[in-house]
């Protein structure tokens, strides 16, 4: 079974400027815009906003 293009792999980059990133999958039908999640950034030591990069 092939991977669906409906759920592509995206990279989330930290907005704190540390260069940290997470890799996740998203559903294009439910989230057509760029994904933004608050996740833990170990370089800063707290939760910050991570945005999808292309």
UniProtKB/Swiss-Prot annotation:
Q: Which InterPro entries match?
A: Ribosomal_bL33, Ribosomal_bL33_CS, Ribosomal_bL33_sf, Ribosomal_zn-bd
- Pfam families in the record: Ribosomal_L33
Which terms does the UniProt entry file under GO BP? translation
Q: Which UniProt keywords apply?
A: Ribonucleoprotein, Ribosomal protein
Give an example GO molecular function: structural constituent of ribosome
Q: Which PANTHER family does this chain map to?
A: 54S RIBOSOMAL PROTEIN L39, MITOCHONDRIAL, LARGE RIBOSOMAL SUBUNIT PROTEIN BL33M
Recorded protein name is Large ribosomal subunit protein bL33C
């Amino acid at each position: 079974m092939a991977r669906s293009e409906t759920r592509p792999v995206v990279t989330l980059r930290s907005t704190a400027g540390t260069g940290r990133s997470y890799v996740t999958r998203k559903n294009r039908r439910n989230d057509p815009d760029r994904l933004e999640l608050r996740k833990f950034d170990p370089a800063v030591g707290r939760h910050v906003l991570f945005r999808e990069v292309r």
